[in-house]
From Swiss-Prot:
CDD domains given in the database record: homeodomain
The keyword GTP-binding appears for this protein: no
Composition bias, Basic and acidic residues: 52-61
DNA-binding region(s) from the entry: 137-196
Keywords assigned by UniProt, alphabetized: Developmental protein, DNA-binding, Homeobox, Nucleus, Transcription, Transcription regulation
SUPFAM superfamilies, A to Z: Homeodomain-like
Upper lineage: Eukaryota, Metazoa, Chordata, Craniata, Vertebrata
Region ranges (Disordered): 52-140
A cellular-component GO term for this protein: nucleus
Gene: rx2
Domain of life assignment: Eukaryota
Native organism: Oryzias latipes (Japanese rice fish)
Full protein name: Retinal homeobox protein Rx2
Length: 327
Protein backbone atom coordinates (compact mmCIF):
# COMPACT_ATOMS: atom_id res chain seq x y z
CA UNK A 1 0.00 0.00 0.00
CA UNK A 2 1.66 3.20 -1.24
CA UNK A 3 0.69 6.77 -0.41
CA UNK A 4 1.38 9.53 -2.85
CA UNK A 5 3.94 12.10 -1.87
CA UNK A 6 1.50 14.88 -2.60
CA UNK A 7 -0.90 13.54 0.00
CA UNK A 8 1.78 13.12 2.65
CA UNK A 9 3.26 16.54 2.01
CA UNK A 10 0.03 18.43 2.34
CA UNK A 11 0.07 18.43 6.18
CA UNK A 12 2.01 21.57 6.99
CA UNK A 13 3.08 23.06 10.30
CA UNK A 14 -0.08 25.15 10.63
CA UNK A 15 -2.01 21.99 11.66
CA UNK A 16 -4.78 21.90 9.07
CA UNK A 17 -7.32 19.13 9.45
CA UNK A 18 -7.73 15.86 7.69
CA UNK A 19 -10.45 17.31 5.49
CA UNK A 20 -8.02 19.68 3.73
CA UNK A 21 -5.56 16.87 3.12
CA UNK A 22 -8.35 14.69 1.79
CA UNK A 23 -9.51 17.37 -0.67
CA UNK A 24 -6.07 18.03 -1.99
CA UNK A 25 -5.24 14.33 -2.31
CA UNK A 26 -8.45 13.78 -4.21
CA UNK A 27 -7.61 16.57 -6.62
CA UNK A 28 -4.09 15.27 -7.11
CA UNK A 29 -5.31 11.78 -7.82
CA UNK A 30 -7.83 12.93 -10.36
CA UNK A 31 -5.21 15.01 -12.17
CA UNK A 32 -2.77 12.15 -12.44
CA UNK A 33 -5.45 9.80 -13.69
CA UNK A 34 -3.99 6.78 -11.85
CA UNK A 35 -5.15 4.81 -8.89
CA UNK A 36 -5.21 6.95 -5.83
CA UNK A 37 -4.74 5.44 -2.41
CA UNK A 38 -6.52 8.16 -0.50
CA UNK A 39 -7.32 8.28 3.22
CA UNK A 40 -10.94 7.34 2.45
CA UNK A 41 -9.81 4.22 0.70
CA UNK A 42 -7.39 3.40 3.48
CA UNK A 43 -10.07 3.90 6.12
CA UNK A 44 -12.65 1.99 4.06
CA UNK A 45 -15.10 4.82 3.35
CA UNK A 46 -17.19 4.65 0.23
CA UNK A 47 -18.73 7.37 -1.86
CA UNK A 48 -22.06 6.90 -0.12
CA UNK A 49 -20.41 7.74 3.21
CA UNK A 50 -18.55 10.72 1.83
CA UNK A 51 -21.03 13.37 3.06
CA UNK A 52 -20.45 12.19 6.63
CA UNK A 53 -16.90 13.47 6.46
CA UNK A 54 -18.02 17.00 5.77
CA UNK A 55 -19.77 19.26 8.26
CA UNK A 56 -23.14 20.15 6.89
CA UNK A 57 -24.89 23.34 8.01
CA UNK A 58 -28.59 23.99 8.40
CA UNK A 59 -29.02 24.76 4.71
CA UNK A 60 -26.86 21.90 3.46
CA UNK A 61 -23.70 23.96 2.79
CA UNK A 62 -20.42 22.26 3.74
CA UNK A 63 -18.44 23.58 6.68
CA UNK A 64 -14.69 23.90 6.33
CA UNK A 65 -12.51 24.72 9.38
CA UNK A 66 -15.63 25.54 11.43
CA UNK A 67 -16.94 28.08 8.88
CA UNK A 68 -19.84 27.69 6.53
CA UNK A 69 -19.18 27.79 2.83
CA UNK A 70 -22.06 29.81 1.51
CA UNK A 71 -23.11 29.51 -2.06
CA UNK A 72 -23.16 33.03 -3.51
CA UNK A 73 -25.98 32.07 -5.87
CA UNK A 74 -28.22 30.76 -3.06
CA UNK A 75 -29.96 33.40 -1.00
CA UNK A 76 -29.56 33.29 2.79
CA UNK A 77 -32.92 33.19 4.59
CA UNK A 78 -33.60 36.17 6.87
CA UNK A 79 -35.21 33.98 9.54
CA UNK A 80 -33.21 30.81 9.99
CA UNK A 81 -35.55 29.55 12.77
CA UNK A 82 -38.76 30.20 10.94
CA UNK A 83 -39.50 26.51 10.51
CA UNK A 84 -39.73 26.04 14.36
CA UNK A 85 -43.16 26.53 15.99
CA UNK A 86 -43.58 29.78 17.85
CA UNK A 87 -43.36 29.44 21.61
CA UNK A 88 -45.69 32.36 22.13
CA UNK A 89 -48.45 30.96 19.96
CA UNK A 90 -51.74 32.07 21.49
CA UNK A 91 -53.60 29.04 20.19
CA UNK A 92 -51.42 26.70 22.24
CA UNK A 93 -51.95 28.82 25.36
CA UNK A 94 -55.68 28.66 24.84
CA UNK A 95 -55.52 24.90 24.51
CA UNK A 96 -53.72 24.65 27.85
CA UNK A 97 -56.22 26.91 29.58
CA UNK A 98 -59.16 25.11 28.04
CA UNK A 99 -57.97 21.79 29.48
CA UNK A 100 -59.57 20.64 32.76
CA UNK A 101 -56.19 20.36 34.51
CA UNK A 102 -56.08 24.04 35.55
CA UNK A 103 -59.80 24.67 36.05
CA UNK A 104 -61.08 26.36 39.22
CA UNK A 105 -63.04 23.27 40.23
CA UNK A 106 -59.90 21.18 40.16
CA UNK A 107 -58.03 23.75 42.25
CA UNK A 108 -60.77 23.74 44.88
CA UNK A 109 -60.72 19.96 44.99
CA UNK A 110 -56.95 19.98 45.48
CA UNK A 111 -57.20 22.49 48.34
CA UNK A 112 -59.90 20.40 50.03
CA UNK A 113 -57.75 17.31 49.70
CA UNK A 114 -54.78 19.04 51.32
CA UNK A 115 -56.97 20.17 54.22
CA UNK A 116 -58.26 16.65 54.74
CA UNK A 117 -54.72 15.28 54.70
CA UNK A 118 -53.62 17.84 57.29
CA UNK A 119 -56.51 16.95 59.56
CA UNK A 120 -55.87 13.21 59.16
CA UNK A 121 -52.18 13.63 59.91
CA UNK A 122 -52.95 15.78 62.95
CA UNK A 123 -50.71 18.65 61.98
CA UNK A 124 -49.92 21.19 64.74
CA UNK A 125 -51.62 23.95 62.80
CA UNK A 126 -54.97 22.16 62.67
CA UNK A 127 -54.69 21.16 66.34
CA UNK A 128 -54.02 24.76 67.35
CA UNK A 129 -57.01 25.94 65.37
CA UNK A 130 -59.24 23.36 67.07
CA UNK A 131 -57.96 24.33 70.52
CA UNK A 132 -58.51 27.98 69.74
CA UNK A 133 -62.10 27.20 68.72
CA UNK A 134 -62.68 25.24 71.92
CA UNK A 135 -61.37 28.05 74.08
CA UNK A 136 -63.81 30.44 72.53
CA UNK A 137 -66.77 28.31 73.65
CA UNK A 138 -65.51 27.82 77.22
CA UNK A 139 -67.99 28.93 79.87
CA UNK A 140 -66.93 31.24 82.67
CA UNK A 141 -66.68 29.76 86.16
CA UNK A 142 -69.46 30.61 88.59
CA UNK A 143 -68.35 32.41 91.74
CA UNK A 144 -70.64 31.66 94.68
CA UNK A 145 -71.14 34.03 97.56
CA UNK A 146 -71.08 33.00 101.22
CA UNK A 147 -74.85 33.21 101.46
CA UNK A 148 -75.33 31.04 98.39
CA UNK A 149 -72.90 28.40 99.64
CA UNK A 150 -74.59 28.38 103.05
CA UNK A 151 -78.02 27.82 101.55
CA UNK A 152 -76.74 25.16 99.17
CA UNK A 153 -75.02 23.29 102.00
CA UNK A 154 -78.20 23.38 104.09
CA UNK A 155 -80.17 21.95 101.18
CA UNK A 156 -77.51 19.28 100.66
CA UNK A 157 -77.76 18.21 104.30
CA UNK A 158 -81.50 17.74 103.89
CA UNK A 159 -81.28 15.81 100.62
CA UNK A 160 -78.41 14.77 98.40
CA UNK A 161 -80.73 14.31 95.41
CA UNK A 162 -83.25 17.16 95.35
CA UNK A 163 -85.95 17.09 92.70
CA UNK A 164 -86.54 19.69 90.03
CA UNK A 165 -89.02 21.69 92.08
CA UNK A 166 -86.69 21.89 95.04
CA UNK A 167 -83.83 22.97 92.81
CA UNK A 168 -85.94 25.65 91.16
CA UNK A 169 -87.07 26.97 94.52
CA UNK A 170 -83.50 27.00 95.80
CA UNK A 171 -82.27 28.69 92.60
CA UNK A 172 -84.87 31.44 93.05
CA UNK A 173 -83.82 31.85 96.67
CA UNK A 174 -80.09 32.18 96.01
CA UNK A 175 -80.51 34.06 92.70
CA UNK A 176 -78.84 31.44 90.51
CA UNK A 177 -79.91 29.53 87.39
CA UNK A 178 -81.37 26.10 88.00
CA UNK A 179 -78.66 24.56 85.81
CA UNK A 180 -75.95 26.00 88.06
CA UNK A 181 -77.66 24.58 91.13
CA UNK A 182 -77.89 21.15 89.50
CA UNK A 183 -74.19 21.20 88.59
CA UNK A 184 -73.28 22.28 92.12
CA UNK A 185 -75.20 19.33 93.58
CA UNK A 186 -73.44 16.94 91.19
CA UNK A 187 -70.02 18.23 92.22
CA UNK A 188 -70.97 18.17 95.90
CA UNK A 189 -72.11 14.55 95.68
CA UNK A 190 -68.84 13.58 93.99
CA UNK A 191 -66.89 15.29 96.77
CA UNK A 192 -68.99 13.53 99.40
CA UNK A 193 -68.31 10.13 97.80
CA UNK A 194 -64.57 10.77 97.75
CA UNK A 195 -64.63 11.72 101.42
CA UNK A 196 -66.59 8.58 102.31
CA UNK A 197 -64.09 6.40 100.47
CA UNK A 198 -61.18 8.05 102.26
CA UNK A 199 -62.81 7.54 105.65
CA UNK A 200 -63.52 3.89 104.88
CA UNK A 201 -59.95 3.25 103.78
CA UNK A 202 -58.65 4.94 106.94
CA UNK A 203 -60.85 2.74 109.14
CA UNK A 204 -59.64 -0.37 107.34
CA UNK A 205 -56.04 0.62 107.94
CA UNK A 206 -56.66 1.11 111.67
CA UNK A 207 -58.49 -2.22 111.98
CA UNK A 208 -55.87 -4.13 110.04
CA UNK A 209 -53.95 -6.71 112.20
CA UNK A 210 -50.79 -6.06 110.23
CA UNK A 211 -50.73 -2.42 111.32
CA UNK A 212 -48.91 -3.28 114.55
CA UNK A 213 -46.08 -4.88 112.59
CA UNK A 214 -45.77 -1.87 110.35
CA UNK A 215 -45.28 0.56 113.21
CA UNK A 216 -41.68 1.70 113.58
CA UNK A 217 -40.08 1.02 116.98
CA UNK A 218 -39.63 3.93 119.34
CA UNK A 219 -36.07 5.23 119.37
CA UNK A 220 -34.34 4.80 122.75
CA UNK A 221 -33.44 8.49 122.88
CA UNK A 222 -37.11 9.43 123.28
CA UNK A 223 -37.46 7.42 126.48
CA UNK A 224 -34.19 8.76 127.86
CA UNK A 225 -35.25 12.33 127.31
CA UNK A 226 -38.75 11.84 128.68
CA UNK A 227 -37.68 10.20 131.95
CA UNK A 228 -35.67 13.00 133.62
CA UNK A 229 -38.33 15.65 133.02
CA UNK A 230 -39.93 16.75 136.32
CA UNK A 231 -43.66 16.43 136.83
CA UNK A 232 -46.07 18.46 138.92
CA UNK A 233 -46.65 17.19 142.48
CA UNK A 234 -50.34 16.51 141.89
CA UNK A 235 -49.53 14.40 138.82
CA UNK A 236 -47.00 12.15 140.54
CA UNK A 237 -48.21 9.09 142.40
CA UNK A 238 -47.39 9.20 146.12
CA UNK A 239 -46.85 5.43 146.16
CA UNK A 240 -43.68 4.50 144.33
CA UNK A 241 -42.05 1.17 143.78
CA UNK A 242 -39.30 2.04 146.25
CA UNK A 243 -41.75 2.75 149.10
CA UNK A 244 -41.97 -0.18 151.52
CA UNK A 245 -45.41 -1.52 152.19
CA UNK A 246 -45.16 -1.18 155.98
CA UNK A 247 -44.81 2.59 155.67
CA UNK A 248 -48.22 2.95 153.99
CA UNK A 249 -50.79 3.62 156.71
CA UNK A 250 -53.58 1.72 155.02
CA UNK A 251 -51.59 -1.50 154.90
CA UNK A 252 -50.39 -1.65 158.51
CA UNK A 253 -51.08 -4.78 160.55
CA UNK A 254 -52.81 -3.03 163.47
CA UNK A 255 -55.17 -0.10 163.16
CA UNK A 256 -54.07 1.28 166.59
CA UNK A 257 -50.63 2.31 165.28
CA UNK A 258 -52.09 4.45 162.49
CA UNK A 259 -51.25 8.12 162.93
CA UNK A 260 -54.03 10.60 162.06
CA UNK A 261 -52.22 12.46 159.28
CA UNK A 262 -54.64 11.80 156.41
CA UNK A 263 -58.12 13.24 156.02
CA UNK A 264 -61.08 11.56 154.38
CA UNK A 265 -63.83 12.71 152.06
CA UNK A 266 -67.55 12.21 152.45
CA UNK A 267 -67.79 9.95 149.36
CA UNK A 268 -65.75 7.20 151.03
CA UNK A 269 -68.09 4.61 152.50
CA UNK A 270 -66.26 3.95 155.74
CA UNK A 271 -67.81 1.41 158.14
CA UNK A 272 -68.65 2.68 161.67
CA UNK A 273 -66.20 2.13 164.47
CA UNK A 274 -63.14 2.22 162.23
CA UNK A 275 -62.20 5.85 162.87
CA UNK A 276 -61.91 5.64 166.68
CA UNK A 277 -58.88 7.21 168.30
CA UNK A 278 -58.10 9.49 165.32
CA UNK A 279 -58.03 13.30 165.41
CA UNK A 280 -58.63 15.40 162.27
CA UNK A 281 -55.70 17.33 160.83
CA UNK A 282 -55.79 20.17 158.35
CA UNK A 283 -59.11 21.80 157.47
CA UNK A 284 -61.93 21.07 159.98
CA UNK A 285 -64.25 19.82 157.21
CA UNK A 286 -62.12 16.72 156.57
CA UNK A 287 -61.74 13.63 158.75
CA UNK A 288 -59.05 10.99 158.92
CA UNK A 289 -59.18 8.16 156.45
CA UNK A 290 -59.99 4.72 157.84
CA UNK A 291 -57.40 1.99 157.43
CA UNK A 292 -57.98 -1.03 155.27
CA UNK A 293 -58.69 -4.33 156.95
CA UNK A 294 -56.18 -7.11 156.85
CA UNK A 295 -58.74 -9.49 155.45
CA UNK A 296 -58.34 -7.86 151.99
CA UNK A 297 -54.95 -8.84 150.65
CA UNK A 298 -53.05 -6.64 148.21
CA UNK A 299 -53.82 -8.84 145.23
CA UNK A 300 -57.57 -8.71 145.85
CA UNK A 301 -57.52 -4.93 146.20
CA UNK A 302 -55.73 -4.57 142.90
CA UNK A 303 -58.06 -6.91 141.07
CA UNK A 304 -61.44 -5.72 142.34
CA UNK A 305 -62.91 -2.50 140.98
CA UNK A 306 -64.03 -1.19 144.37
CA UNK A 307 -60.58 -1.59 145.82
CA UNK A 308 -59.08 0.13 142.80
CA UNK A 309 -61.40 3.09 143.28
CA UNK A 310 -60.47 3.31 146.93
CA UNK A 311 -56.80 3.22 146.05
CA UNK A 312 -57.24 6.06 143.59
CA UNK A 313 -59.17 8.09 146.16
CA UNK A 314 -56.49 7.52 148.74
CA UNK A 315 -53.76 8.60 146.36
CA UNK A 316 -55.70 11.73 145.55
CA UNK A 317 -56.15 12.55 149.22
CA UNK A 318 -52.45 12.10 149.90
CA UNK A 319 -51.50 14.39 147.05
CA UNK A 320 -53.98 17.02 148.25
CA UNK A 321 -52.60 16.84 151.80
CA UNK A 322 -49.08 17.36 150.51
CA UNK A 323 -50.12 20.47 148.62
CA UNK A 324 -51.85 21.86 151.70
CA UNK A 325 -48.81 21.20 153.84
CA UNK A 326 -46.64 23.14 151.40
CA UNK A 327 -49.09 26.02 151.56
Amino acid sequence: MHLSMDTLGMVDDSGHGIVDSYDMAKGAGSSNGGRVHSIDVILGFTKDQEPLLHSVGDDGSPKVNGALQQDPAKPVPSEPYGNLPELGDSSQHHSYHDSSLFSSDKCEEMSNLTKEVDIADGSPKSIKEEEHGKKKHRRNRTTFTTYQLHELERAFEKSHYPDVYSREELATKVNLPEVRVQVWFQNRRAKWRRQEKMDTSTMKLHDSPMLSFNRPPMPPSVGQVANPMPLDPWLTSPISSATPMHTIPGFMSSPQTLQPTYSSHSFLNSPPGMVQGMQPMGPPAYQCAPPFNDKYPVEDDRNSSIAALRMKAKEHIQSMDKTWQHM
